[in-house]
């Protein structure tokens, strides 16, 4: 995961200091990209320990089309707690947009199912896109989508994915985003009979919060270790039929966790 370490270093060395919505302040850069060949291992940051359960359960929650934290809480995941209202609702966030994008005539578009069908029937398409950025709904979301658009591509029997992330909390959020979309690519590949190819992570505003700088410096003193491998239940292929227990990561031997506050 030298790519991730290089992004941390780039921000610390070249980042511009700015105020932000949270009041904490950031230093950041604009327009960066990382690439991960999924045949080389599961891209899970090793210079600090990540909570794998949160990554997997959140992705399954997105794919359910869910926007209430009850499912997350039932599965021991608390990463969305700060943004939920008293009923656990988050408004029309990722799951709603992925699975039930509202149309002007009162119907809904299941973008994930549409892309699945299109990959199977028209793999050369350049329209294999899912967007979570819905201007009509943004003001009703507890947190507008940071990872807001992704595109699939089929080449030589391999499924590739590129994510555009408009806003990237590089210390806390990005390690989760890398692993989440890498796993989504693998799940989509399984569902469409393809091999996982490359995950490309493209950033708009990539930043470190000012209260994460010491943690980032500490992380840069650590040498990345070998990537783990992720095993998926060989009996499963339905994209919407997975459960947390269907996944197992082997060979994950990271450096210790680094604690840092969340900017809300």
Curated annotation (Swiss-Prot):
What GO biological process terms are annotated to this protein in UniProt?
Answer: dTMP biosynthetic process; dTTP biosynthetic process; methylation
| Active-site feature positions | 146 (nucleophile)
Please tell me whether the keyword Oxidoreductase is annotated for this protein. no
The protein's location, in the record's own words, is:
Cytoplasm
Q: Which residues form the signal peptide?
A: none
Q: Which residues cross the membrane?
A: none
Concerning InterPro entries, the annotation shows: Thymidate_synth/dCMP_Mease (IPR045097), Thymidate_synth/dCMP_Mease_dom (IPR023451), Thymidate_synth/dCMP_Mease_sf (IPR036926), Thymidylate_synthase (IPR000398), Thymidylate_synthase_AS (IPR020940)
Q: List the disulfide bonds.
A: none
Q: Which residues bind (6R)-5,10-methylene-5,6,7,8-tetrahydrofolate?
A: 51, 169, 263
One Pfam family name is Thymidylat_synt
The terms describing its cellular component in GO are: cytosol
Cite the annotated pathway: Pyrimidine metabolism; dTTP biosynthesis
Query: According to its UniProt record, which reaction does this protein catalyse?
Result: dUMP + (6R)-5,10-methylene-5,6,7,8-tetrahydrofolate = 7,8-dihydrofolate + dTMP
**Amino-acid positions noted as binding dUMP in the UniProt annotation, renumbered to this chain:** 21, 126-127, 166-169, 177, 207-209
Per the UniProt record, which EC number(s) apply here? 2.1.1.45
Say if the entry is tagged with keyword Cytoplasm. Answer: yes
Keywords, sorted A to Z: Cytoplasm, Methyltransferase, Nucleotide biosynthesis, Transferase
Q: How does it assemble?
A: Homodimer.
Q: Which NCBIfam families match?
A: PRK01827.1-3, PRK01827.1-5, thym_sym
Report what the protein is called. Thymidylate synthase
């Amino acid at each position: 995961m030298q790519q991730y370490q290089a992004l941390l270093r780039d921000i610390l060395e070249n980042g511009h200091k700015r105020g932000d919505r949270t009041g904490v302040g950031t230093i950041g850069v604009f327009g960066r990209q990382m690439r991960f060949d999924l045949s080389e291992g599961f891209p899970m940051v090793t210079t600090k320990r990540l909570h794998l359960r949160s990554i997997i359960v959140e992705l399954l929650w997105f794919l359910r089309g869910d926007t209430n934290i009850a499912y997350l809480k039932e599965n021991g995941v608390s990463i969305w707690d700060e943004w939920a209202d008293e009923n656990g609702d988050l408004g029309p966030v990722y799951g709603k947009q992925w699975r039930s994008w509202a149309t002007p005539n009162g119907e809904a578009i299941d973008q994930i199912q549409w892309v699945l069908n299109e990959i199977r029937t028209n793999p050369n398409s350049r329209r294999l896109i899912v967007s979570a950025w819905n201007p009509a709904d943004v003001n009703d979301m507890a947190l507008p989508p940071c990872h807001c658009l992704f595109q699939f591509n089929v080449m030589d029997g391999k499924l590739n994915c590129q994510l555009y992330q408009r806003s990237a909390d590089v210390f806390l959020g990005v390690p989760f985003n890398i692993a989440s979309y890498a796993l989504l690519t693998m799940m989509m590949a399984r569902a469409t009979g393809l091999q996982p190819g490359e995950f490309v992570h493209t950033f708009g505003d990539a930043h470190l919060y000012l209260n994460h700088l010491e943690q980032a410096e500490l992380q840069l003193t650590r040498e990345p270790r070998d990537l783990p491998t992720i095993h998926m239940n060989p009996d499963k292929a339905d994209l919407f039929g997975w459960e947390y227990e269907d996944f197992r990561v082997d060979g994950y031997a990271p450096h210790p966790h680094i604690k840092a506050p969340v900017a809300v």
